[in-house]
Amino acid sequence: MATLARLQARSSTVGNQYYFRNSVVDPFRIKENDAAVKIQSWFRGCQVRAYVRHLNRIVTIIQKWWRSFLGRKQYQLTVQVAYYTMMMNLYNAMAVRKQRRWRGYRVRKYLFNYYYLKEYLRVVSETNDAIRKALEEFAEMKEREEKKANLEREEKKRDYQARKMHYLLSTKQIPGIYNSPFRKEPDPWELQLQKAKPLTHRRPKVKQKDSTSLNDWLACTSARSFPRSEILPPINRKQCQGPFRDITEVLEQRYKPLEPTLWVAEPIDELKLAREELRREEWLRNVNDNMFLPFSSYHKNEKYIPSMHLSSKYCPISHKEQFRSENPKKWICDKDFQTVLPSFELFSKYGKLYSKAGQIV
């Protein structure tokens, strides 16, 4: 009770104290509230930033794993494509190698035998060398024969000239022009004239024409009834010496053929002949005798005439692809022809049919 009475006595002052105490505490409360708000905002900021950092770290890890997964997947696709590309390139290279080997074998065996052609060319080269050597020897022999013939011709010409100029030979009384007394020794032509004989001109034989009349066949009038004697040479007649011309030249000059003038040599119908010759040349130069007409409807009804080469039942030979034709149906056995170099028929005749310097070898 005493306490209650004491508290009731103080109740008037408690309100004032409470008011003053609260009025003094309000600024501290506001300050503490602001401090608490600042601390709380700073703490929440740190908490949020830590959480954001955590989220960033987690997102980075997730992105790293995801991107690594996508990278590995893309890398696997790239490796797979590269593997398939490498395998296709390898397959293509192997196929090309097989095709190259097979085509080379096929060409060498069936189309173009390189070793056969090489051996053939080697034999042809050796044969050509042998023939060229033989031809060179033959040419040298011909050249020697030609030189010998030229020397003989020159010798005969000098002999004929010496016989023709035999009248210039020196005598006991008069020296010749080649034996001048002012020279120490005579000219070589003087010795040539001494060795030569004087040239004698033979008279041309007169050919007697045999008549074919009936009277000539009689025994009394026939030329074959009595033997005829040849013309005898003149008796005690000296040979004329002097610079006379050859009888053949004189006869050629005397009986030379007629040389007509241009007016006489040309024919009268020269213009007509020239026109015929020109027409003949134009006809020879003409490629097609048919008249050229447009291609619209003129050649529409013409029947195509195939060439003889295409209309034949035999197929054309593929040149430059094979050296001989193969027909397995005509083979006696299953073996193919042996690739042995055949003999040359032309070269085998060498030394048997050719002549060397007019003598059969």
Curated annotation (Swiss-Prot):
SUPFAM superfamilies: P-loop containing nucleoside triphosphate hydrolases (SSF52540). One of its GO terms (molecular function) is calmodulin binding. It is found in: Cytoplasm. Residues 32-61, 55-84, 91-120 form the IQ domain. One of its GO terms (cellular component) is spindle pole. It comes from the Eukaryota. Keywords: Calmodulin-binding, Cytoplasm, Repeat. The keyword Metal-binding does not apply. GO terms for biological process: establishment of meiotic spindle localization; mitotic cell cycle; spindle organization. InterPro entries: ASPM, IQ_motif_EF-hand-BS, P-loop_NTPase. This is Spermatogenesis-associated protein 17. It comes from Macaca fascicularis. The lineage of its organism: Eukaryota, Metazoa, Chordata, Craniata, Vertebrata.
